[in-house]
C-alpha cells in the first residue's frame, strides 16, 4: 500500500495495522518522492530563515553593544567557511526528517523511526538534495606529498578523509538517544534511562561538584602550564561547532531568552533549592551541537569536528585552506605568518587582528577598541593565557622560517613556510607525548596505552572519538579561579596581577595594553595548577560565575559538560568501563570500591539510581587519580586510546621514517617548551626539567643559557 502525504496534511486516513502480537510493523508504508522533496524544500526555507534571523540578531546586538556572553561565545564556536556548508547540509537533512515524522505521527501514535517508511532510494534522495552526499566526493591524492594538507585530507591514502576537518566524529560505542535516533536523554519528562529517572545536570553539579573556593588544594607537582597546554592541545584536535542559529527551526523561538525546549534549544532546568538561582522557572541556556552528515546511517545523529584530528599545530595554521592563506604573509618569499601591524609586545610580534565586521572582543573594553586576534583556531582570544600560547608559536614559526632562509637562500616562500610548519607540528607532538601525556596518565597507564612508537599503520583510525570530546574536559578540574601575571623576578606585577577568570574572557586588550604575554607565561610556569580531589572537583568561578558579569545568569561548566554528553548521545559510565575492560559496579558498595570513596558513591547513586546512567564526565572525574597521573582509570583508558590512534594513524608523525631524516629527528629530540619560550620572549629564566611539573620559583627554574637550542644544520640542502 502506498501512503500519499501532502505538505498540508494527509489526503486520506490510514487504517492502523498491527502485527499479531501488537508490535509496530517494521514498515509503515511508502511515501511519495514528491512528498520527500517537498519536506526538503520546506526544511531549507526553515533553516535558511533561522540562520538569517541569527545573523541579523547578533549584528544588532554587537552594533548596539548589548551582546551577551553567549553571543560572544557564539562568535568563537559558530560554524564558518567549509564547516558552515557541512553543517547547513546536515541541518537540512535532520529538519526534513523531522518534518516527515511530524506529518506521519497522526497516523501512528506509537514511537517509530522515520526511516521505516523510506526506501533506500529515498534516503539517498534526501542525502543528495540536502547536500550531504557531496561531502563524500572522491578525493584524489597526489602521488608524492612531502607535507600535510591543511585540511588533513590524504594523510591516509587508502581512506583520504580519515582525520580530515569537517567530518563526523567516530563512535567507539553506538549512540544512546532517548528515541534511539536523536533526542537526548532528559528531553522528555518522565522518560527513564535504564529504569531510572534522569537527574538534572545542574542538580548533579550542585550535589557533587560544588565546594567552597577557600578549600581549594594547590597541586604541588603540576604547574598551571599543565592546564594551559591541555586547552591549547584540545583546540588543535577538536572543535564541535554550535548551531548557526539560536532560534527554533519550527517556531522561531529565541533559545537565549526562552526556557522552552525546542530544537536546537536544550536549556538546563533549575532544581529545587538551588544555592544561586532562586527562580525555578529560570534556566541556563544551552544549544545542541551541530549535527554531521553521516555516511552509513543518516538518521542517527552524530556531531561534526571542524578541525583536523591530527596533532599538527592546526591551531597555528588552520584546518581550512582559505584561513591558512589568510594567516600567511604572502607579500614576500620569506615563508612567514602574518603579524599585527598596529601593535607590538615589547618589540616582539603579536598575532594579526581578525577582520570581523562586528567584533565581540571590542565589547570587553569599549574604550580600548582592541579587536579579537586571528589564529588557526577561532577560539584563540577566549582567554589571554590561550592567546599567549598561540602567539608563542606564531613567533616560533617566523623564527624558524627566518633561520631556514639563512641556511637555504634559494628556498622560496612556500618551501620555507612548509618546512617551518613541519617543525612546529613536530614540536607540538613531542611536547604532548614526551612531556604532557605521561603526567596526565601516570607511568602505568602510559605504558599500557601508549607503548613505544613502532611505525605508521594505515589501518588505525585517527579520527577523534565523540566520547573523547567529553572525556578530555577533565582539564576543567585543573583550573585556578584567577589569571596570574608575574614580573621578571617572578613577583606579582602591574595593577592587576591576579584577575578573576570571569574578567578575562575575550579580553584581547589585556594582552595588548597590560604588558604582553611574558607576565602571563611566567604566571603559568610559576603557579600551581588546582588539584582534582573527590570533594573539590571544579572551582565556582566556572561553576557559578562563568560570564556572569554581563549575563542574566552565570553558566555552570560542569553541568554544561553533562548536558553535552546527553546531547551527543554518549553511553553512560558503565558502558565505557566495559569498553575499557574495567569492572562495572552495580551497587553502592561496588561503586564505593571502584571510587575508593563510599560517601561519593552514595551521592552519585542518590542522583542517578544506577552506575549505568552516570554521565561520562561526572563518572570520569570522580575516580581516584592514577599514581602520578591526574586522571582515573576510565579517563586514562579513553585519553590514552585516543592519543595512541592519533599517533599510530598519522602518516606524518614526526618519528615515522621518511618524514624527517635521522639527523633531523635527533635534533628535534632536544626541543622543549621552555626553550621555545626563551627564543621568542623577553623571559630569561624558565622552568627546568618538565615545564608541566615545575612550579616553584626559584627552586625549579634555570637560566635560558643552560637550555640547548634546536640545531637546524641538518635542514641545510647541499
From Swiss-Prot:
Assigned keywords, A-Z: Calcium, Disulfide bond, Glycoprotein, Heme, Hydrogen peroxide, Iron, Lysosome, Metal-binding, Oxidation, Oxidoreductase, Peroxidase, Signal
Signal peptide: 1-15
Propiece residue ranges: 16-138
Species of the source: Mus musculus
Site (Transition state stabilizer): 379
Gene Ontology process terms (BP): defense response to fungus; hydrogen peroxide catabolic process; hypochlorous acid biosynthetic process; low-density lipoprotein particle remodeling; removal of superoxide radicals; respiratory burst involved in defense response; response to food; response to gold nanoparticle
Keyword Zinc-finger: no
GO cellular component: azurophil granule; extracellular space; mitochondrion; nucleoplasm; secretory granule
Cofactor section: Ca(2+); heme b
Binding site for Ca(2+): 236, 308, 310, 312, 314
Cellular localisation: Lysosome
Reactions this protein catalyses: chloride + H2O2 + H(+) = hypochlorous acid + H2O
Subunit structure as annotated in this protein's UniProt entry: Homodimer; disulfide-linked. Each monomer consists of a light and a heavy chain. Found in a complex with CP and LTF; interacts directly with CP, which protects CP antioxidant properties by MPO.
Gene Ontology terms for molecular function: heme binding; heparin binding; metal ion binding; peroxidase activity
Cystine crosslinks: 141-154, 255-265, 259-283, 361-372, 580-637, 678-704
InterPro entries per UniProt: Haem_peroxidase_animal (IPR019791), Haem_peroxidase_sf (IPR010255), Haem_peroxidase_sf_animal (IPR037120)
Annotated EC: 1.11.2.2
Positions that bind heme b: 234, 382-383, 476
UniProt modified residues of type Cysteine sulfenic acid (-SOH): 290
Positions annotated as glycosylated: 113, 297, 329, 365, 457, 711
Highest taxon in the source lineage: Eukaryota
Function, as annotated: Part of the host defense system of polymorphonuclear leukocytes. It is responsible for microbicidal activity against a wide range of organisms. In the stimulated PMN, MPO catalyzes the production of hypohalous acids, primarily hypochlorous acid in physiologic situations, and other toxic intermediates that greatly enhance PMN microbicidal activity. Mediates the proteolytic cleavage of alpha-1-microglobulin to form t-alpha-1-microglobulin, which potently inhibits oxidation of low density lipoprotein particles and limits vascular damage.
Protein family: Belongs to the peroxidase family. XPO subfamily.
Protein name: Myeloperoxidase
